[in-house]
């Protein structure tokens, strides 16, 4: 699926076709849509491939020849197995910053992307690519925090039940939650390293007015 958005006086607005200064959002793009991204928009093929690789870790990549930057970050997700069991995991999300566009590419929908589409970010402008990226990272870090609080709540609840009655189902649930914590801890450390590279690097121009937002993201990730 390919979607196109652009900010206007009314906020975040979906548009029918890509145009300069817009945000292109690709979720589980088909082969035809991938070709459109590479041939019509000009996104590097390896950037599209990396963004859709579930094993890809958080990092920053820059292509000097085409002046394109790829930022891969991990974002939290969950799968509700049944009423008592929830599985938490992380997925990669690619953000391509290039001439004329900012492009997000992922295999699955994410809370952060949906929040941007729904206009929940104040003062966002699709033409301001650095601010767009940092706002997305802020939403992702806030989602991590929400999930961590829920994991803590479920862990405490499960431990309390196990103290009263030891059972295999409860033990498996607790192990799954601990596994989720390990995933999240690893992903947050990787995202934090990527955030520091963004701040130190020259590939993404960090404007003075973006410094406060960058600091907000750092605080949330810590």
Question: What residue spans do the PLM features occupy?
Answer:
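Peripheral, non-transmembrane regulatory/ligand-interaction domains of membrane transport proteins
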Residues: 1-220
């Amino acid at each position: 699926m390919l979607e196109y958005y652009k900010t206007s006086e009314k906020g975040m607005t979906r548009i029918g076709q890509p145009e300069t200064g817009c945000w292109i959002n690709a979720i589980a793009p088909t082969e035809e849509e991938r070709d459109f991204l590479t041939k019509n928009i000009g996104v590097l093929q390896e950037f599209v491939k990396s963004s859709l690789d579930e094993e890809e870790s958080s990092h920053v990549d820059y292509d000097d020849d085409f002046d394109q930057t790829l930022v891969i970050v991990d974002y939290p997700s969950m799968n509700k197995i049944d009423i008592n069991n929830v599985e938490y995991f992380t997925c990669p999300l690619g953000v391509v910053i290039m001439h004329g566009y900012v492009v997000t590419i992922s295999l699955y929908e994410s809370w952060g992307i949906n929040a941007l589409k729904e206009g929940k970010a104040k003062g966002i402008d699709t033409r301001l690519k650095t601010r767009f990226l940092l706002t997305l990272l802020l939403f992702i870090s806030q989602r991590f925090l929400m999930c961590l609080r829920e994991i803590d709540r479920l862990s405490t609840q499960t431990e309390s039940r196990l103290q009263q009655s030891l059972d295999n189902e409860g033990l498996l649930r607790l192990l799954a939650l601990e596994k989720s914590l390990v995933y999240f801890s690893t992903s947050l450390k990787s995202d934090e390293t990527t955030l520091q590279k963004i701040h130190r690097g020259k590939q993404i121009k960090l404007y003075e007015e973006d410094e406060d937002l960058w600091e907000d993201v750092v605080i949330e990730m810590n």
